[in-house]
Amino acid sequence: NNHGLQIQQQQQRNLSLHEYMSMELLQEAGVSIPKGHVAKSPDEAYAIAKKLGSKDVVIKAQVLAGGRGKGTFESGLKGGVKIVFSPEEAKAVSSQMIGKKLFTKQTGEKGRICNQVLVCERRYPRREYYFAITMERSFQGPVLIGSSQGGVNIEDVAAETPEAIVKEPIDIVEGIKKEQAVRLAQKMGFPPSIVDSAAENMIKLYNLFLKYDATMVEINPMVEDSDGAVLCMDAKINFDSNSAYRQKKIFDLQDWTQEDERDKDAAKANLNYIGLDGNIGCLVNGAGLAMATMDIIKLHGGTPANFLDVGGGATVHQVTEAFKLITSDKKVLSILVNIFGGIMRCDVIAQGIVMAVKDLEIKIPVVVRLQGTRVDDAKALIADSGLKILACDDLDEAAKMVVKLSEIVTLTKQAQVDVKFQLPI
């Protein structure tokens, strides 16, 4: 039952927080977690380990990338999660993490800088479970997901033993009921003596999910420890960027050192940008058209350097910022602008293109394909600018042209020849 609500699709850029920040939110919500604190220097790590007073503590590198346990630091240290047995060892290990880049499968060769570590007590799990809350289209709302197989990659569990994953949809209007949480805890295999405790933690996590407009709360693992207590050992929370206006406290926590510089600039200019490995820059309005443009470039033997959707209501300023983003990538050898003007006016895009080409002194070829609202005004603006911008009405032709031009620029670079492009308007 969707209560007659019309679900409107929106562009979404999810915010991810560091584990220690997520754990602090869990603690505030009354969820059971191991004791621990974040350290920004080896000396702080020493002091926290000493204060915890347990015979062994866990040092966890704080980087926004998966697979840290199997990663390698530039210091040579293997693994982003380490068990240590003294405050001195905590200091030594954290000194090989803090201020160093961690390389994992997810980060690739760029790596991610580790600026802090989480120092926490070691607990001994008797059993590990997987628990998550996410939004699922098939249920038109939130769903609780649980599995008796925690502490491992849930994608592997889904592929190998899908029956080990259980789901409990929640009616977003009525909210979570205790019997739903209890039912899930039982299906996940929690012993009867701690089913209620597990269910209570699930309800608190669901309330946190709602309170902060999260798109996902993932606990892997949720455990029964050797004392028979239910604990959340790790937390990953994603937040919907559309809620930034009412979740200022959360969005102010964003760690920009973990983001690609270009993603940071794109977020400031309110552009949907993803950097890729190719050499043909793309500037398009609408995510669907942007993907189709990348496909047609690939079809003609080229490789896109980015996904960039300027959206339906782009301003001259945003178009200029989009060009800055594209040209900041030194791999880009040619640019294809593909605009279909519905709400978006082609003449506004043309003004932005002309301004960007002039201000940024763009030396690489720019191919522009414009169709729709005020297209004739746009073409006149480009023609009157006196700039060497190549206009083309047909997308297929435009794609062929931009691929060919990128090949020519590649050849001139290899031959170390400086070529000035005199393109017909």
From Swiss-Prot:
Positions marked as site (Important for substrate specificity): 56, 124
Cofactor binding summary note: Binds 1 Mg(2+) ion per subunit.
PTM sites of type Phosphotyrosine: 46
Modified residues (Phosphoserine): 241
Modified residues (N6-succinyllysine): 50
SUPFAM superfamilies referenced in this protein's UniProt entry, alphabetically: Glutathione synthetase ATP-binding domain-like (SSF56059), Succinyl-CoA synthetase domains (SSF52210)
Keyword annotations from UniProtKB, A to Z: Acetylation, ATP-binding, Ligase, Magnesium, Metal-binding, Mitochondrion, Nucleotide-binding, Phosphoprotein, Transit peptide, Tricarboxylic acid cycle
Protein name per UniProt: Succinate--CoA ligase [ADP-forming] subunit beta, mitochondrial
Organism annotation: Sus scrofa (Pig)
